């Protein structure tokens, strides 16, 4: 199962999700039809102190569950998930590019995925010093961006932040 889903995005007919784990173990998942993602048996998070049962199984596969593509321990409180803008896709040279916001880590996270979209091959974080909640989308679900590639992110402090990516290749 899933514990606390936060964001969903589709790339090339594949569905990706972010979810909060318990005291760590936040996940990026590739959703597979009829797949079981382990909750409440398997998690990379830690049980809360008021629960007397043993810790979670760390390995999802040993129990027939699907492993996350990526997990964060300690927790970053991952939130929204969107496909990268065309400018970022061109810059990184791949369709498999996702943006996620984080509340606790207060950063924008860029996930780079393999060509098959079945594993994370790179991750970048940009710190904002604010709890980031949502990335603006168009009515059709595409990530909203201005002609220069900038995006807009809302924070829990009530701010709307315009993010411009200075995409200069070495």
Segments predicted by a language model, with ranges:
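Beta-propeller domain segments
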Residues: 1-121, 140-150, 168-170
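Surface loops and adjacent helix of pleckstrin homology
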Residues: 20, 156, 165
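Short coil-to-beta transitions that initiate beta-strands within beta-rich domains
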Residues: 77-78, 128-134
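Structural signature of WD-repeat beta-propellers
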Residues: 103, 155-156
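A generic structural signal for well-ordered alpha-helical surface patches
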Residues: 106, 130-133, 158
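Conserved beta-strand positions that form and line the central face of beta-propeller blades
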Residues: 125
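Short beta-strand-to-coil "C-cap" segments at the C-terminal boundary of structured domains/repeats
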Residues: 161-169
